[in-house]
């Protein structure tokens, strides 16, 4: 029965992807029906804010994005610092210390949602609503807007206006879907209230304080926007965030909704629907491989415990919730790191070595399918590299969407590809070279190395999940992960927008018999191979020293 439920869940991922992709294309490219519904409200927003609907250059678009996000970071930083004297604070929670406020503001603005605090004890309701939830809408809207400009550039069209795209992302995508799904979560048992904690008497007569709050509205955008931060410290393992299997499946669907839809949106916008389908299918195969690997490892149990003769019919159940089971916990871990969300319904630090390797590799690849917008930019980065390598092998000038890929584009792409591992491995090396970093390790040896690398990988790709045995609530970790989150977010977005702008100016080369097609199975295979060779092998030495060495030791 459990496998039937898994297959149905997978089919739901596939069935909703294309219709959502079509909707996104209409929402951003102009649809008379949608303009009639949302247009008046959007025009009112533009009038109040003074936004003028004109086409921006790539530099203007990127600058608008960075400045708006920077302004939001500053505003929310002061909300966190001053929450102790602000209203909606029934628990009388004090303001955050400076480095934690710095880390948290950047974390939620970059769609990472790395949390070095416990949700219910670290933030007031005002901070949760005005600070956290506000950024949970703004962060994915930022990258969804950018990916639309990116695709327009690839299609040879004007990039558009960031503020217009940002507004449409909010009004036409995130607000309506989040509102409806929040109501569904309430129906499934997730609380939604501004009342403070309640005191309950347990069956043994002890009084217990039960924290609640506006959880349903928080969870809906948490998953839809690939945010991942928890209202409660234990995230989606908490019964108030994720009461049962229905809410669990809905959360996974929301995480996968926009990332899986974007290949179809891309195909329609560039006039090559088949290429969009090839990208979707290729990535889904990689996703399935990851799910099969982690599930097999978790069902086989912990090798050390198996050697002691301990029963493991349910697999490795350490750190897992009984109401979800091993299989759906494995699926959730695969989804949350493939879609770069970071929400967890099981403790990733307790996964078996190979089980923990899958979420880590998903994040290192950052393409299967990646987070809202930013993930798809990475997908196209690897697609262009695949075309470039193929062109070199046959002695032809590489072409993508009929446009020549030349030195300027490849230099920007090369810098983008190299920057990602440099951030992760460079800061990991820094942490390992000082007691400020190594003192946070709770498990010495191979697993301790994995804890550190996982933290910086999660930060760099804006995932936010963690091996929570790491004691990261310190000044060192707050500052270093904050820097990694900021650089990991904006550097690649700006450089790849420059690539799209460069391709926009190029004329389309007529297709010939010798043109390397990017809408067939051959390209799909080369695309997957490029992801594995360029992406996974970059981190292979670290994976050998971390989870693989731990696995061999346990064996």
Curated annotation (Swiss-Prot):
UniProt keyword annotation of Nuclease present: no
Superkingdom classification of source: Bacteria
Membrane-protein topology: Multi-pass membrane protein
Residue ranges crossing the lipid bilayer per the database entry: 2-22, 60-80, 130-150, 173-193, 246-266, 278-298, 374-394, 412-432, 483-503, 525-545
One CC-aspect GO term: plasma membrane
Location of the protein in the cell: Cell membrane
Swiss-Prot/TrEMBL keywords: Cell membrane, Ion transport, Membrane, Potassium, Potassium transport, Transmembrane, Transmembrane helix, Transport
Homology family: Belongs to the KdpA family.
NCBIfam families linked: kdpA
General function of this protein: Part of the high-affinity ATP-driven potassium transport (or Kdp) system, which catalyzes the hydrolysis of ATP coupled with the electrogenic transport of potassium into the cytoplasm. This subunit binds the extracellular potassium ions and delivers the ions to the membrane domain of KdpB through an intramembrane tunnel.
PANTHER family referenced in this protein's UniProt entry, alphabetically: POTASSIUM-TRANSPORTING ATPASE A CHAIN (PTHR30607), POTASSIUM-TRANSPORTING ATPASE POTASSIUM-BINDING SUBUNIT (PTHR30607:SF2)
Protein name as annotated: Potassium-transporting ATPase potassium-binding subunit
